[in-house]
């Protein structure tokens, strides 16, 4: 008799094989492999196109009055970015998170905020070499074919079948219920931001590129709090030490920095992880730097040797 854990492992393993097409006849298995191959290629192309659009956009500002509202540290960073591209005396802003988000949050120049926002939201939708519309259509078509090969009416039900939700109907019921609470709250917040805009007497209507800027102003007005004031408490070193302290409190592990360990980039740090009894758990590589040639995201990978 299998133990409960063994039975669960067997069920999950069996389902994984079924979802990979093990029950399909040979010709359909071959087609499924081809679909998976195409989806992989299309997914990589899609991501690369977005990355290219991120890197291609450059907003140069040549007049200091157009920097109104931007913190000094951000101006200095933008000037250094422009200098690195040979544009001395200008300020460079890009679509990367570290540039785009502070710009939308602090820039008093509404036309430039709009330009920045629209450039970001329209990545892959500019009818150029990086356009993703055809790729999206191909992905949707292939996903549907894959789902139907495996006995599902749509791709979302194929994906959700392996989750707690089980199907798209359950997900939509949950989202619609959540929407009934979230929408009135969002409308109230928008009205509050619009009221703040109206005080300026410009007769402008709240748009997506205004949201961060007026939220920051509202925070200052209501709570006398500026995000800049709390930044020093969230330096990388402080956040990392805080995370390590939480790991120690929750799991009893300690992380000690190691020197002289081979790394794939000079910015990477290496830590030895030990359990509460002092036994070694593993080695933890921390890469905290954002790179322009990589998609902005956070991930943790494990390697067992």
Model-predicted regions and their roles:
Residues 9-10, 41, 48, 53-94, ...:
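Active-site-proximal, well-structured secondary-structure segments within enzyme catalytic domains
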Residues 303-305:
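Hydrophobic alpha-helical segments, chiefly the membrane-spanning helices
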Residues 3-158, 242:
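Noncatalytic, helix-rich "gating/capping" subdomain that lines the substrate-entry/channel surface
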